[in-house]
Amino acid sequence: MTFELGLNYWPRRRAMYMWRELDLAEVRDEMAQIADIGFEVVRVFALTEDFLPQPLTVDARMVDRLVQVVAVAAEAGLRVVPTLIVLNMSGRIWWPRWMLDAGGAPVDLYSDATALRSQALLVRTCAEALRDAGGAIRAFDLTNEIDDAQRPPSRDAGRGWCALLGDTVRRAAPGVPIQIGAHLPSLSANNNMRVDDLAGIADEDLMHAYPLYCDVARSFLDPELVPFSCALTAGLAGTGRRPLMQEFGLCTAPRGSAGLTITDDFLGQARDQYLASEDEAAEYYYAVLERLVRTGAAGAYAWCYADYDARLFDRPPLAAAIRERTFGLVRADGTEKPAAAVFRAFRSRRDAGAVVQGSVPNVLDVSADEYYRDPATHFARLYSTWCSASSNGGDGA
């Protein structure tokens, strides 16, 4: 199996406003740059606010734009992972107005009949529109970190919601793999989106991990958290599949500046965040990629393509979430940061046969049920063991 290189994508001049302000020429240029760096997959996001503006109403214009973006990516030789239910994105929850009551409280995504039917209609419509895309669709990702938008009220609710959407996509686009965009709370908290439950619905086991958002990480630049999270995901899934790191990355300080810590807004809470120097970011990406290969990951999707144009800084989410402005491998002016060269060199080595994946370490020493009785304690305990083994020259197992 070849280690897969992917990139999460929003355009640098449009960010989350890409669908309502779509510039296909801009997307075409950026997809060409993404392919040139060495990526083979792009993950894009059908923002629910744009695609589902009313109950039981999918905006056909937005679906057509998604089809066009997939076609443009395919022209560049890229395959696409469309994420279909996107409420939580880049430090903001993008609720469609109809999902909020007069007091601003959201509908129950997991039990409200109209909300469920509407979400199922959206994923079905997108899957049907793209099922004949000539192999351009790498997979359908059902959702992005949905529990940050609204935590399922129970394990059964989370599992049932994913199963409904997964079954809907499978009927609409048979044979296309299904992913579910999960993040660290599925490993470290009782968020009712258990990895073993997701593994029974999806065709791939995957995770998002950032030291920036993890109190167990040893530093903002800790290179072990991502490979550990990947290996733990594989252990909890219990499928024997190689795990995919669907999101990892870090934000950077301005070009030529040293790294600095800031206090930033994280979904309404103040949190320290680190803007790495561009050289630190390159070193981090190199270290994490090498560890992911050594510990048997299926691949890695960096977050994200580009920094955003300063003209977007007075609009949500970038007006409040400062870190989200500069997660890119490419600067807002289109020039590449040193981290882009890390991926370009990695792709060259991979294609030359110099990248050899190891086996996934067995890090889990309890059953999934036992683990989820106290996930925070087990996560910290197992990570400590992993780091101790790594410091002694092992692979964390």
Placement of each model-derived feature along the sequence:
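Aromatic-rich peripheral "rim/lid" segments of glycoside hydrolase catalytic domains that contact
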Residues: 18, 99, 119, 284, ...
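Amphipathic alpha-helical segments in well-structured domains
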Residues: 63-66, 158-162, 226, 281-285, ...
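Active-site mouth of glycoside hydrolases
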Residues: 1-202, 240, 309-312
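Short, solvent-exposed beta-strand-terminating loops
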Residues: 82-93, 249-259, 299-312
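Generic structural signal for well-ordered alpha-helical scaffold segments
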Residues: 127-131, 231-234, 289
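A short acidic, glycine-rich active-site loop
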Residues: 104-117, 269-283, 327-332
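Glycoside hydrolase catalytic-domain groove-lining segments
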Residues: 160, 164-166, 173-266, 293, ...
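Histidine/acidic-residue-rich catalytic or RNA/ligand-binding cores of hydrolases
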Residues: 253-269, 280, 284-285, 312-320
